[in-house]
């Protein structure tokens, strides 16, 4: 028989009031008190202080791209375009980050992969700032506002894997069809709701005005730890 499990413990948020509001939104039970709690955080003309590392969560790729490019243009210094190395069969729709990653000193970036080394210095969704670019050595130095140690970032390789069943040996085997190599980073002044799934941010600006699907706003709000 099928076993049903219900996950009840919330790890992302710890504030009981915030958890209650999120649950009421999910269950379509939002009351006036919940609305007042949400509206208390609405600031139409809000502009974050420089280096506060807010990230804007929005509904469309074009809006996230526009914000990222506008913020990148505000930075002085040379723009560096880093091309990914794609080998064999790796479909463009499956690229984990931009094929051409555009960076500048001071750019706000987000890691898109967990650190698999022993030190675990970064994780998927961690936000930092580009401090040095040494592309001749294929290195980017990223610093963090939380005081954690700077990280020298190198290219990572993703594999396009096909799984097949080996009947003779009764086991599943992997076949690597192609690879994608790029720095595990993306510009992070803004990101879409879709790409923020599973991530947690300490500071976020929620752009709810262009949400078009049921549950999008609640999904945005749940990205924020509190």
PLM regions: where:
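C-terminal accessory regions
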Residues: 110-148, 152-226
């Amino acid at each position: 028989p099928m076993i049903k499990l219900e996950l009840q413990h919330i790890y992302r948020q710890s504030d009981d009031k915030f958890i209650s509001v999120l649950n009421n939104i999910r269950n379509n039970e939002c009351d006036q008190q919940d609305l007042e709690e949400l509206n208390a955080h609405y600031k139409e003309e809000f502009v974050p202080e420089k280096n506060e590392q807010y990230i804007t969560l929005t509904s469309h790729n074009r809006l996230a791209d526009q914000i990222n490019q506008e913020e990148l243009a505000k930075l002085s210094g040379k723009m560096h375009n880093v091309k990914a190395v794609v080998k064999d069969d790796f479909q463009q729709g499956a690229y984990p980050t931009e094929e051409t990653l555009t960076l500048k000193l001071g750019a706000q970036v987000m890691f898109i992969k967990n650190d698999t080394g022993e030190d675990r210095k970064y994780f998927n969704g961690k936000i930092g700032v580009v401090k040095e670019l040494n592309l001749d050595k294929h290195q980017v130095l990223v610093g963090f506002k939380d005081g954690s140690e700077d990280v020298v970032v190198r290219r990572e390789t993703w594999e396009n894997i096909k799984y097949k069943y080996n009947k003779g040996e009764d086991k599943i085997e992997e076949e690597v069809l192609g690879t994608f190599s790029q720095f595990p980073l993306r510009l992070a002044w803004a990101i879409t709701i879709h790409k923020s799934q599973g991530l947690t941010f300490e500071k976020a600006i929620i752009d709810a005005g262009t949400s078009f699907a049921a549950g999008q706003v609640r999904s945005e709000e749940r990205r924020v730890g509190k």
